[in-house]
């Protein structure tokens, strides 16, 4: 296309010698040679420098990207490590909490057993004390009943029973008779009640 334009301009130049658009042939050749030299110098000196600078820059960028990727992998590995440590810590905390709850339940159960044993011992002591007190009361009541019976027998008979053994025998027989007599469970209500 440029060639066609130059040829067209040359033909016109032949007709019009003083055309502004068509330069003289010598100038055109010198201009083309100068342009070729400039392009040659560019490819000989400047282009290799540009390629070298471009390659260095690309290498720096790739190195930066590699470092960034390596740092990202390291950060990801650290993140995974932290996550696993966190999960481990959580499971450890759950295990400790379960152990504490189990120990708490065991302590409560031991305390409950201990309290039940103490309550049973207190009941046994109270029952034993009640039995002893009842026996004491029964013995005291029997003595008093014996004395009252003796006094009553003395009044009824009109004379004092002279023998101690005989007195005791009489009291014991009276008390035995009381023990054998049927005891009412409840007092019957009278007609006025």
Curated annotation (Swiss-Prot):
In the UniProt record, the signal sequence range is: none
Q: Which GO terms describe its cellular component?
A: plasma membrane; proton-transporting ATP synthase complex
What domain of life is recorded for the organism? Bacteria
Transmembrane segments in this chain: where?
Answer: 24-44
Cell compartment(s), UniProt: Cell membrane
Q: Which UniProt keywords apply?
A: ATP synthesis, Cell membrane, CF(0), Hydrogen ion transport, Ion transport, Membrane, Transmembrane, Transmembrane helix, Transport
Instruction: Name the principal localization, coarsely classed.
Output: membrane
Q: Which Pfam families match?
A: ATP-synt_B
Q: Which GO terms describe its molecular function?
A: proton-transporting ATP synthase activity, rotational mechanism; proton-transporting ATPase activity, rotational mechanism
Q: Does the keyword Hydrolase apply?
A: no
Query: How does this protein assemble?
Result: F-type ATPases have 2 components, F(1) - the catalytic core - and F(0) - the membrane proton channel. F(1) has five subunits: alpha(3), beta(3), gamma(1), delta(1), epsilon(1). F(0) has three main subunits: a(1), b(2) and c(10-14). The alpha and beta chains form an alternating ring which encloses part of the gamma chain. F(1) is attached to F(0) by a central stalk formed by the gamma and epsilon chains, while a peripheral stalk is formed by the delta and b chains.
Which family is it part of?
Belongs to the ATPase B chain family.
Q: Please give the function described in this protein's UniProt entry.
A: F(1)F(0) ATP synthase produces ATP from ADP in the presence of a proton or sodium gradient. F-type ATPases consist of two structural domains, F(1) containing the extramembraneous catalytic core and F(0) containing the membrane proton channel, linked together by a central stalk and a peripheral stalk. During catalysis, ATP synthesis in the catalytic domain of F(1) is coupled via a rotary mechanism of the central stalk subunits to proton translocation. Component of the F(0) channel, it forms part of the peripheral stalk, linking F(1) to F(0).
Question: How is this protein named in the record?
Answer: ATP synthase subunit b
* Upper taxonomic lineage: Bacteria, Bacillati, Actinomycetota, Actinomycetes, Frankiales
**Gene name tied to this protein:** atpF
């Amino acid at each position: 296309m440029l060639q066609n334009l130059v040829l067209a301009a040359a033909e016109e130049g032949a007709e019009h010698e003083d055309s502004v658009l068509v330069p003289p042939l010598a100038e055109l050749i010198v201009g083309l040679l100068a342009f070729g030299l400039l392009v040659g110098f560019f490819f000989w000196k400047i282009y290799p420098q540009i390629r070298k600078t471009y390659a260095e820059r690309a290498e720096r960028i790739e190195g930066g990207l590699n470092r960034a990727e390596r740092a990202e992998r390291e950060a990801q590995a650290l993140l995974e490590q932290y996550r696993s440590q966190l999960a481990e810590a959580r499971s450890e905390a759950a295990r400790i909490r379960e152990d504490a709850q189990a120990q708490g339940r065991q302590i409560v159960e031991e305390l409950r057993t201990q309290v039940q044993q103490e309550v049973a011992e207190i009941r046994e002591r109270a029952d034993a004390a009640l039995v002893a007190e009842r026996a004491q009361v029964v013995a005291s009541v029997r003595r008093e009943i014996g004395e009252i019976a003796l006094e009553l027998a003395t009044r009824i008979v009109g004379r004092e029973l002279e023998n101690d053994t005989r007195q005791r025998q009489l009291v014991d027989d009276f008390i035995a008779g009381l023990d054998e007599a049927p005891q009412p469970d409840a007092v019957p209500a009278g007609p006025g009640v």
